[in-house]
Design a protein with these regions (language model features):
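Extended beta-strand/beta-hairpin segments
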Residues: 1-54, 63-138
Length: 138
């Protein structure tokens, strides 16, 4: 028997009185704002939706690598993750992720962390694709 467990919840709210594309978000106990940049007609009050998705991937990558390194007893002065969502003229999409680790990190540890990065929860969800069920309520 398959068991489904709730992993994350996010709620987005906007209304006629909200500035152009601004949306108030709630993720657990945290409140955020999403918006479009001024160049797209928004007020640039927060990240655009794809920025939020890419931020989630970057955060999950950095957190997972840090957890792994700490469990192994490895000291990492920093982990920087740069994620870019790209779309070609014909609509093909790709994500480029660049992870910067300390220069003095031994090659075998660097290789192991590269392998771990390929299996973070958000990486796997994006790669596998996730079925989305939409319900419209009054």
């Amino acid at each position: 028997m398959t068991t489904t467990r709730h992993v994350a919840l996010a709620v987005a709210v906007t209304g006629a009185s909200a500035p152009q594309w601004r949306v108030e978000l709630r993720a657990g106990a945290h409140q955020l704002v999403a918006d479009e940049p001024a160049t797209s007609g928004g007020g640039d009050a927060g990240p655009a939706p794809f920025g939020l998705v890419m931020s989630g991937l970057a955060a999950c990558t950095a957190m997972t690598l840090r957890m792994y390194a700490e469990r192994k007893g490895w000291t990492l002065a920093s982990i920087d993750v740069d994620v870019r969502y790209n779309v070609t003229d014909d609509g093909a999409a790709s994500i480029d992720r660049t992870i910067s680790l300390p220069v003095d990190l031994p090659a075998e540890r660097r290789d192991r962390l590269a392998d771990v990065a390929e299996r973070t929860p958000v990486t796997l969800a994006l790669r596998r694709g996730v079925p989305i069920t939409t319900t419209i309520r009054p």
